[in-house]
């Protein structure tokens, strides 16, 4: 595991805005002047009511969409002027994703699902990459399930596989959109415990969208979004 400098800047948003259908009768501004910084080793919850812009913001941060205003810096690099190929390359190299629905491939083994981002990147994984994937499965208590098909394990186990998959590329930034939305309370707490562990041990910045105030409070920091604006950004006790 490589050393990292805690709080070294991973992400910076400067006056970020997003408007859909600009210049038309359907124009709608959903994000307004968002300023945010995330550092290595920082675990941050993003909360807010439905329709507040959380998913839109996560899509912008994940380089899945482009802002209408402002700038997004990832690892110190401005992203606004990047072409599609460069954005895709930076996203694949620097960002891991965990969603409410795990999107595992049912007919593939648990191990192959974890390795999938590496297979997409450069084909057959190296022995070192396979070993890392197995280490991640060990960390999420699923090493013994490596050869099972993804559709042969429980929903909570599938979400843990998704976390291992998101980390196999050693991303600088991990984005999680309602990752516990379909899980019971005990399983949800175990998933958040994994985020805290990997945030601490891997040194990645983690941003988690959640509707659960208890889980948000377990993060080091909570950012609240209302009507497309950050109304609160505070450390948790």
What are the residue ranges of the model-derived segments?
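ABC family nucleotide-binding domain
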Residues: 8-11, 16-218, 222-225
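H-loop (His-switch) and adjacent beta-strand-loop-beta switch element
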Residues: 222-235
């Amino acid at each position: 595991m490589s050393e990292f400098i805690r709080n070294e800047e991973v992400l910076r948003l400067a006056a970020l805005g997003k408007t859909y259908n600009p210049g038309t009768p359907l124009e709608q501004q959903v994000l307004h002047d968002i300023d945010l910084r995330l550092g290595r080793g920082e675990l941050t919850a993003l909360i807010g009511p439905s329709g507040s812009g959380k998913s839109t913001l996560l899509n912008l941060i994940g380089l899945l969409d482009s802002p209408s205003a402002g700038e997004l810096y990832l690892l110190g690099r401005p992203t606004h002027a990047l072409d599609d190929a460069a954005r895709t390359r930076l996203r694949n190299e620097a960002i891991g994703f965990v969603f409410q629905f795990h999107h595992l491939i049912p007919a593939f083994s648990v191990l192959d699902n974890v390795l999938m981002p590496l297979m997409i990147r450069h084909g057959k994984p190296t022995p070192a990459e396979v070993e890392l994937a197995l280490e991640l499965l060990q960390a999420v208590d699923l090493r013994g399930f490596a050869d099972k098909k993804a559709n042969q394990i429980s929903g909570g186990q599938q979400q843990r596989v998704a976390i291992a998959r998101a980390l196999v590329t050693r991303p600088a930034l991990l984005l999680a959109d309602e990752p516990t939305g379909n899980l019971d309370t005990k399983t949800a707490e175990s998933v958040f415990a994994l985020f805290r562990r990997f945030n601490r041990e891997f040194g990645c910045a983690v941003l988690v969208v959640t509707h659960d105030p208890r889980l948000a409070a377990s993060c080091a920091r909570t950012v609240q979004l209302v009507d497309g604006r950050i109304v609160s950004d505070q450390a948790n006790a």
